[in-house]
Amino acid sequence: MKKLIAVAVLSACGSLAHANTNIPNYNTDAHLYEFTQTYDLVVPKGSQGQTNLWVPLPFNGEYQQVKSIHFEGNYMNAYVTENNKYGAKTLFATWNKDAQKRDLKVMMVIETKDREPMVKGALENYTPPKDIQYSVDVQEYLKATPHIKTDGIVKEFPDKILGKETNPLKKAELIHHWFVKNMERDNSVLGCGDGDVEKILTTGVLKGKCTDINSVFVALARAAGIPAREIFGIRLGAAEKMGKYSKGAFGSANEQGIANVSGGQHCRAEFYLAGFGWVPVDSADVAKMRLAEKKSVEDKDTQAVAKYLFGNWEANWVGFNHARDFDLYPQPELAPINNFGYPYAEVGGDPLNSFDPKEFKYDYVSKKL
């Protein structure tokens, strides 16, 4: 059994899109989780050859820190890399074509902090600088990608929603509340959705899961001149604050704080305000709560959740990366990939079904410490 212990191997989130480091820290309650991932990869019928596995790992930042990481398995080789456009941290493991089993276990201890700038009143009197100039790393999140278009029908939506509003914070809030009123969750969608914004808006089927809804938020914000990005990650347990509105929509765990989170992948979003930094938002979870609890848009619980999730996040969740429409490293047969919120694997170039833990054969368990 090969083992590799790596403590503090996950450095800060690279150079991409840093917020203003001179502002106060508005992260509040801290949480500590033990997060264990177990893989026993199943070779698809008819596939043969070398097996390659790419696992997304959490980044370190002001609101989340990987305190330790340890991985072991019967792999031929395994290492951590950030060698991709977005610096998305990746554990890459490979098994030779004659391997009888393909085992990997990853154990992490992660500290997260609730992000609550809006709760703390940090944006109450926000006024944008007269001359807004974004750094090169922030400008990256104004650009279009194949799934995040910013012209054509995508540009038409914020033009209609925002009218003559010029304050970026108020523009983002108008976009968020448009989602609350107009987009719904569709549990039949595979995984977290593919987040094809142009397709969603062109068809007029304003439904989907978290990647669909929050990708539309990101695209509309970018089209309105506001830097924005998704963050692909996973829920780690129960939501102590938001749980009063729904026991299941925002994450759950047993009485011992243990949760099977194999299906807990969740995409969030954030937008950038000049002179302040990145602001959290999660329009998709408003739709998820509405569906789970059968609430109307006008219901007081819906409105309370919508208010909290603009400018705040509860940290029973950890983020992996902001990567979209990019190439993993080493490059797989499928390139580029849409996003990197799930593990990805190929056997002889044939992809495994990342969205089905039983078919792919992975098991994720989180425990609150």
Curated annotation (Swiss-Prot):
The keyword Lyase does not apply. Keywords: Signal. It comes from the Bacteria. Residues 1-19 form the signal peptide. It holds the Pfam family Transglut_core. InterPro entries: Papain-like_cys_pep_sf, Transglutaminase-like. This is Uncharacterized protein HI_1048. It comes from Haemophilus influenzae (strain ATCC 51907 / DSM 11121 / KW20 / Rd).
